A protein has these predicted regions:
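Generic anion/oxyanion-binding catalytic loop in active/binding sites
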Residues: 8, 15, 24, 171, ...
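A short, mixed-charge helix-start or loop-turn motif at secondary-structure junctions
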Residues: 5-8, 40, 149-151
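Beta/alpha (TIM)-barrel catalytic core signal, keyed to glycine-rich beta->alpha loops juxtaposed to Asp/Glu
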Residues: 43-235
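Active-site groove signature of glycoside hydrolases
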Residues: 27-46
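Active-site mouth loops of central-metabolism enzymes
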Residues: 2-20, 47
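Non-cysteine beta-strand/loop elements that form the S-adenosyl-L-methionine
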Residues: 1, 37-38, 121-125
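Short, acidic/polar
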Residues: 14-30, 75-82
């Protein structure tokens, strides 16, 4: 898989020129003439531009058997809906919105994607580092915009989510549980009916092993029952 719209040379440039250059550059770096999927990556406030020249290029490359599937990775569910409505999307990637802290796409993107047989990628199940195991903290020294862009709302850089994340971590820590186990297994139980995957985003082998361990550790039913009683969340 590769993506368009994210290279520093053409960041969030969804023109025909930028899209074509990005694809050619990715294929060159990957030393391939075919990829299974390409995602339109990260439009922030405008969904129409990516669905014009950029999508046209991807559809053309797909027709020429250069790529297998077309997708979009973006935060807003209304952007997912608009993309799915084109009839050209095979995949939608969402992030931060099916976690222990937020399940908003369970009522928006997931039902629509299932109805239209569009694959779902659920990203950031650990909400950055907030649900990764260590005590949740936000870097108060990091300068943030007064109005967070959509991609950062509810993220590890959003002070609004820290209190609940810390309460969940403390609840687990008091019981010798790892919050990461619950976070990963909750995401894996998302109601995608076999038509989706969870993208954890490990940056090294150690993190990969930690995620695998959390996915396969046994979490007793009574733990989920108690967690639901405390936070209203369960599998």
């Amino acid at each position: 898989q590769t993506k368009v719209g994210s290279h520093p040379r053409f960041l969030r440039d969804f023109s025909k020129e930028a899209t074509t250059w990005s694809l050619e550059n990715s294929f060159k770096l990957l030393r391939t003439d075919y990829v299974d999927s390409v995602l339109i990556h990260g439009p922030r406030y405008d969904i129409e531009a990516p669905l014009q020249e950029c999508l046209d290029v991807l559809v053309d490359w797909k027709s020429k058997k250069r790529l297998g599937h077309i997708g979009i990775g973006v935060r807003q569910p209304e952007f997912h809906r608009r993309a799915i409505e084109t009839g050209e999307m095979d995949i939608v990637l969402s992030f931060l919105d099916y976690t222990l802290l937020s399940q908003s796409i369970a009522k928006t993107t997931i039902p629509l994607a299932l109805e239209k047989d569009v694959g779902i990628i659920l990203g950031s199940p650990l909400t950055g580092s907030l649900l990764a195991g260590p005590e949740p903290k936000i870097d108060v020294e990091k300068e943030l915009p007064s109005d967070l862009p959509p991609s950062l709302i509810g993220s590890k850089l959003d002070p609004a989510v820290l209190p609940v994340a810390h309460q969940m971590w403390k609840w687990c820590d008091d019981r010798d549980l790892n919050i990461r186990d619950l976070a990963i297994q909750f995401a894996l139980q998302a109601p995608v009916e076999g038509n989706g995957i969870v993208l954890t985003g490990p940056s090294n082998l150690k993190e990969f092993d930690e995620v695998y361990k959390s996915a396969t550790n046994e979490v007793p039913k009574n733990v989920w029952q108690d967690f639901k009683h405390a936070f209203g969340i369960s599998i």
